[in-house]
Amino acid sequence: MTDETVKSLAEEIQTPVERLVQQFADAGIEKTVSDSVSQKEKETLLAWLNRDKDISTGQPSKLTLQRKVRSTLSVPGTGGKSKSVAIEVRKKRTYVNRDVIEKSQAEEQALREAEEKAHREVEEKAQREAQEKAQRAAEEKAKREAQEAKKQAEEKAKREAEEAKREAAELAKREAAEKNKVKQNDKPKADVADQDKARRNAELAELKRKTEEAQRLKVEEETRAAAEKARRLAEENAEKWTAEPKAPETESADYHVTTSRYARDAEDESDAEVEGDRRRGRTAKAPRAKKNNRHSEKADREEARAAGRSNKKGKRKSSTLQQGFHKPAVAVNRDVIIGETISVAELANKMAVKGSEVIKTMMKMGAMATINQVLDQETAQLVAEEMGHKVILRRENELEEQVMNDRDTGEESEVSRAPVVTIMGHVDHGKTSLLDYIRSTKVASGEAGGITQHIGAYHVKTDKGEITFLDTPGHAAFTSMRARGAQVTDIVVLVVAADDGVMPQTIEAIQHAKAANVPVVVAVNKIDKHEADPDRVKTELSQYGILSEDWGGETQFMHVSAKQGLGIDELLDAILLQAEVLELKAVKEGMASGVVIESYLDKGRGPVATILVREGTLNKGDIVLCGFEYGRIRAMRNELGQEVQSAGPSMPVEILGLSNVPSAGDEATVVRDEKKAREVALYRQGKFREVKLARQQKSKLENMFANMEEGKVSELNIVLKTDVQGTCEAITDALVKLSTDEVKLRIIGSGVGGITETDATLAAASEAIILGFNVRADASARRIIEQESVDLRYYSVIYSLIDEIKLAMSGMLAPEYKQEIMGLAEVRDVFKSPKFGAVAGCMVVEGNIKRNNPIRVLRDNVVIYEGELESLRRFKDDVNEVRNGMECGIGVKNYNDVRVGDMIEVFQVIEIKRSIA
């Protein structure tokens, strides 16, 4: 029989080929679609597939059921109506064949008991061997010590016997000598001597016996002591060797009562009853469900106790849940990463301590802080090191530096580039007209009021070379624009009208040029007028350090006329000569970088930014990072509105595709990765917000009274929308400078583009007026403005805007009140009147006395009363006015202490309106 392939087997059993290949792989058999399958491999696959089934019945050991219960719920809606909501409860439950489980558990139990039995036998055998080994070692040691003790005792006894023998020999020798002497001297006493000799021999024998007995007792005692010592040693070693080795501590399995059999049955019954309650109204069976719940809880507790008892009997660790946290015995030193700024709460979190501990440490170091206060890097480092942690300082702009370093700036040498020339000067001195003549177009006519209100960047090709011109506004409100123009320029052309001389913005332009260290070329314009006086211009400029070459200075003075075109060629020659002296060069290849000259929001094209390229080549499709914004260039246009594909150094272009309107003056850089550009832009936005919050000072003691007075200050809220970003900055700066101590001007919203519905809603909510500069409101915004009666004003010239805001703020100023003395009367006599009390008979000595005017009563030129003139009579007639030199009767309201000689002064309060200068 030929083996069939995997594909034919899949067709035979009607299963997908990929699934069969995967099942073979799961079973440990690597097969492809075209491989053959043997009978043995089929049996292996079948055995693997039946691993979860009962072999005897072929039924699965596990069964998973999914249950769905659908019901509806009435939910009250608007207008008192209720609506039905369909609810579907899905449950998934797994049932296990208990016979298979119990069988496997029994097998596991038997296997576990066999393992325990084998383990016990091995332990008992090892214990017996250890005991026998210890006993043998003790016996050998005791035997060895006994032999040594016996040997020592024998040697000692031998030595003592030899000494006793030697003493006996000496004694016998002495006795023999004495015996010879006795025989010679006294023969008859021989019997007595024999008796003494016998007695001494008996004493020697007794002494020898006692010595041997003492030696034997001593040896036996030493032997017993050695045996006892060996026995104790054997017992100690046996305890050590037979001690059961400590089992490694293992994590106790979490015991959950719902995993038991009875708990599962109780849970199933409870679920069934709850579902029945939902079908029948949920009222009748609720107590039973509660009872069943109590029953299941009781069963669970009993089962848990039984499990605990069985664990105790089996000497196994209890499986109940226990808390696993242990308080560290020693302080933990951490590596704390600190950026440029960090709050107290964040610092405490990184050190894993409470915020109060950090505040306490700072107080000990002499610094007061709150939980949300932002700390600088040095302070945070000192605090962390004081608390025993290691500090790792991290630069916040690490990602930004990485992105900027990963740029292809070009390897080629630098080439000459066109000079960037900024035309500066006082308003109406002819800057735009001069540039207009050079470009041979009429730009000035397009500006409202004939004055420039945003920077214009133009690239001009002349016969003598290329020049990039920047035209800046001359009005006082555009200081930031002129400063920005001076920063990106190479040469400043200072335009001064020959008939007007040096003006405030001319001086400011000189200061900007000196601050930027930029050479200046002076163009004395309007030279064709009869009132022109070029020498006066030279004299006035010399006072500010601008000396003509004729007078020994370094500045070129060119006499031009923008109307008639006089001296224009000479001016261009002077500019190109100055550029040649500066040797202006830039890298042409590589990723571009430049400066945002101007930006605005176009309704059809979105955010538009005018960029002056400084180095490299800016191509369509490049990813640009501009300050807080980023994006891919979708289109590029030159100053003539023509589409271009690339722009080199010193070329101004308009780009489309940024995420939002960038701020004028931001640096534009081409980067590789759009994702990293977005991260850098978001980081810059967050950093700007942090710096802004850090600058906001809390209310302190020194400015407490100023804060108390703020409630009395009138506020004028303004929503400002302009056509370009630079104009918005200029108007904002000019308006903020109008604020005084009594009237505060707040710009609650500003932006570039048309007036939208959001702007109108903001103005209505904050009671603000909307100022539109060269922009208009759309239909939805106009509807809200009409409904809420919001004050909306359009402007195209900045003079008119500032003047009207001054008038509005003047109307909010509190008026001044001045007292003017109208007349003075001398009291000549005092009369009593039942109606008015004391009436003063007076002579008018100065001015006129009018009725119902406030008066003062003077006595010895000291004011003693201030009140109101109640009654004025001449003779018996009531009059409204009494002139100088006439007599009258005056009744003072609520005052009766009028005396002769007093002076009555009549005055009036005049209201004087104030205005903002």
Swiss-Prot record:
Tell me which residues make up the tr-type G domain: 416-585
Q: Where is this region: G2?
A: 450-454
Query: Got a GO cellular component term for this one?
Result: cytosol
The answer to keyword Cytoplasm applying to this record is yes
Per UniProt, the ranges with Basic residues bias are 279-293
Q: Where is the stretch described as G3?
A: 471-474
> Which CDD domains does the UniProt record give?
IF2_eIF5B (cd01887), IF2_mtIF2_II (cd03702), mtIF2_IVc (cd03692), UDM1_RNF168_RNF169-like (cd22249)
Q: Where is this region: G1?
A: 425-432
* Name recorded for this polypeptide: Translation initiation factor IF-2
Q: Which organism is it from?
A: Proteus vulgaris
